[in-house]
Each structure stands twice: as C-alpha cells, then as structure tokens.
C-alpha cells in the first residue's frame, strides 16, 4: 500500500508494447525483471513490504494491436535511491509475450507540490480570513501614527510656522503649503519640511530659503501654481515638485510622494513649463516703456513751444499789409516763390535720391558681416566646443566627449544625470542643450570631468574649481 504520509517522490513513466497487455502483466514484469538486479536493499518486493515503495499505479489502453499507457510509482527513498530505482525500470524490454519499452518522463517532488499548495492556501487565508479584523487594527495604527506625528511637529520663528524637526539642521528643506502637508510628510519620515500657510509667504520662510537648498512641493492644482509664483518673487528656490494633477500633498501616499519628489525639476526649467517667465516679462518691459514715454513727452511739449513764436509772427505780417492795402497783391506774388520752394523741395528730394542710392550700397551691410564674424574673438575653449554646441541647439540632447573631443556617447538631457553616474569611460567634456545645474556640476566634479557646456547656468551655490563651465553667452 502507498503510505501517503512518507511519500517524497513519484516516478512517472510511459510504456509502449507491440501487442495487447494488461495491468497485471505490467506489474508482474516490473517485479520479475528487477528482482535481484539491484541487490536486497533495493528489491521492490521488500521495499513495498516496508512501505518505502507505494502501490504501483498503471493506466494503459490498447489500440490497433498496440498498448500504450503510464506507470506511477510512489517512493519514500532518498533522491539517489529513487533515481537508481527509476533507471532500473528502463531495463524492462518484454511484458508477457510482447516486446515493450518503458521510458522515465518525470520524477515529481511531492514536497514541492505541497509547498505550492501551502503558499496558495496561506494567501487565501491572509486575504479572506483576516479582513474582518483589519479595519479595527488599522484604526489603532492610524491613531498611534497620528499621535507620533503631532509630537514630532515643531514650530519655526515668531509666527510659529509648522515645520519638521530637522528644518534648522538640514542643508535641504521642502516647502509645502499647509500644516496638513507637513503632517503627511512626517508620517512617511520626511522631517525637513516647512509650510508657508498659503500664498502669503512669511518673512521667516523667505529668509530661511536663502541659506538652504529648497524644493517647493505644492498641490497639483491652480493654487499650487500660484504659490510657486509667490515663492519665486520673495524666496530663493532651487527645485519645484508638483503633486499629480488634481491631488493635494496631504492626500498622497508614500509611493506618490517619493515619485513626485524624484521628478522635481530645476527652477529654470519650471519657469518655462509653468509659463511663469511669460507673466514676468511684461513687468520688466512695461517699466522701460513707461520711461521711454516720459522722455518723449518733454520733446513733444518743446516742439509746440517752438511753433508758438511762428504763429505769433503771422499776425505781424498782416499788420504790414494793412499799412499798404494796395500792395495786397504782392503777397500773392510772394506766394509764387512757394513754387520755388516746391522746386527747392524737388531739388532737395532729388539730392536725397542721389544720396539714397549710395546709402543702399554703403558699408552697413559690410559692417554687419564683421559683426557676424565675431567668433574670431571667441576664447580657445569656446572655439573648441562650438561645433558640438551648434549641432545640439534645439535637440535637448547631450554629447559625452573624451580627451580628444571625440564623441563617446550621445543621450537625452533628461537622462544625462543617470548616464554620467553609470558611465566610467574617461569622459572629459560634456556638451548638452540644457541648464547647468548644481547637481550636474557636482557629478561632473566627482567623475573628473573638466568641461561642462550648456545653454545657461542655473542656481549654482558652489562651483568646483576643477570644472570649467561654458554657456551660450560664451559663444
């Protein structure tokens, strides 16, 4: 009999015979042809009596004068003995009067099957049988977390602004909108946060941002955008992070918070993304426009003052004509010289025409050409990297160069940080169509990169002496 409690392996084999055979014939052939083959320790009859071999199961069928089927032998032997026993079955070449062939197809580990069943059952028990207790335990855990968060919250400045415990000591801080945002970030271990309490940024926060690396983390709505605009005017911000569209920072879970902070962008790039630069331009352009108008107004006032004496002289002329009434026709003759004035004007118009033609052929165009030829005055470093810089304009791409200024690799600007971290192929220069930020500059210094060429510089607090930075203004 098969002892299911001690079965470790099941030997799977298939049999084919040139004739019609039945189960007793196959079982008899197995016992008969393996008897004495492997010695007394592995004799099938003795192993079955002691329970180390279970009941031999046979499933066969006859079709077209031939028999095919499967044989299953349970075993509680170890792996070596089970393998020897399985190999001995393949030595059987006849079953009854028919030629037969047995082939081992699989040795199944019963314990592995049991382990799979245990895992599946445990999943079911965990998900279905513990559901009733989860809400109550979750409420207890939330209550404990809430009490810990309230104890960890501190207050900064005279206005007692809610903040995390590490705001003063940390080199980098996260600026959020309200007290609930600080609590939510404390819940997930982010302790260097401080809130602004709306669009009216407290002076303490504005002063604190000048001393640290600041990331503004706001809601994914219009209010969050307004807070960013306010911070850009009164505070010093390095990076901007936004919650997903339509969500608030206080409602985010840990995965969403980490993703949003990892996707932060430099403030220079955010100015273009959130169209803050376009809103700020009219403010700068209006002031010079007003100044120019103010300077023009005095000129317009001076001109009518000059015309007033001319108007005053006109009434003096008719006074002379009144003294000589008969000579009133003479002014008409004097009006004829107006034709001469017209002639003079024609002469004057002719002379400018003659002067205009040489003006068109004059050297301003020639003078413009040397203005375009200014690259001759560029520094040797700028001339060295100008071909790469010109080729990358508008592509948002980057080139990694070796000591001979040959291209090692090309990548996108958004992947430049990861590429520099992973690449150790002797990069000496990096030319890219983007902003030179503090992060890229630090990585370049760590990697031994000598030259960084970008569109413009970001908010750089520390510039390593070992890295030479060039921007579009150098070209």
From Swiss-Prot:
Cofactor note (record): Binds two Mg(2+) per subunit.
The family database entries (Gene3D superfamilies) matched by this protein are listed as: 3.40.1360.10
Q: Which SMART domains match?
A: TOPRIM (SM00493)
Which cofactors? Answer: Mg(2+)
The residues that the entry says bind Mg(2+) 2 are 219, 221
Q: Name one Pfam family in it.
A: Toprim_4
InterPro entries listed in its UniProt record: DnaG_primase, Primase_DnaG_arc, TOPRIM_DnaG/twinkle, TOPRIM_dom
Q: Where is the composition biased (Basic and acidic residues)?
A: 319-374
A single GO CC term, please?
exosome (RNase complex)
PROSITE patterns for the chain: TOPRIM
GO MF term list? DNA-directed RNA polymerase activity; metal ion binding; poly(A) binding
Entry EC number(s)? 2.7.7.101
**Where is the Toprim domain positioned along the sequence?**
171-257
Alphabetized, the UniProt keywords read: DNA replication, DNA-directed RNA polymerase, Exosome, Magnesium, Metal-binding, Nucleotidyltransferase, Primosome, Transcription, Transferase
Residues recorded as binding Mg(2+) 1, renumbered to this chain, are: 177, 219
Task: List the residue ranges of the region (Disordered).
Answer: 282-381
Query: Which GO BP terms, alphabetically?
Result: DNA replication, synthesis of primer
Catalytic activity annotation = ssDNA + n NTP = ssDNA/pppN(pN)n-1 hybrid + (n-1) diphosphate
Q: Which family does it belong to?
A: Belongs to the archaeal DnaG primase family.
Described by its record, this protein's role is as follows: RNA polymerase that catalyzes the synthesis of short RNA molecules used as primers for DNA polymerase during DNA replication. Also part of the exosome, which is a complex involved in RNA degradation. Acts as a poly(A)-binding protein that enhances the interaction between heteromeric, adenine-rich transcripts and the exosome.
What is the annotated quaternary arrangement, including any partners? Forms a ternary complex with MCM helicase and DNA. Component of the archaeal exosome complex.
* Protein's recorded name: DNA primase DnaG
* Organism of derivation: Methanococcoides burtonii (strain DSM 6242 / NBRC 107633 / OCM 468 / ACE-M)
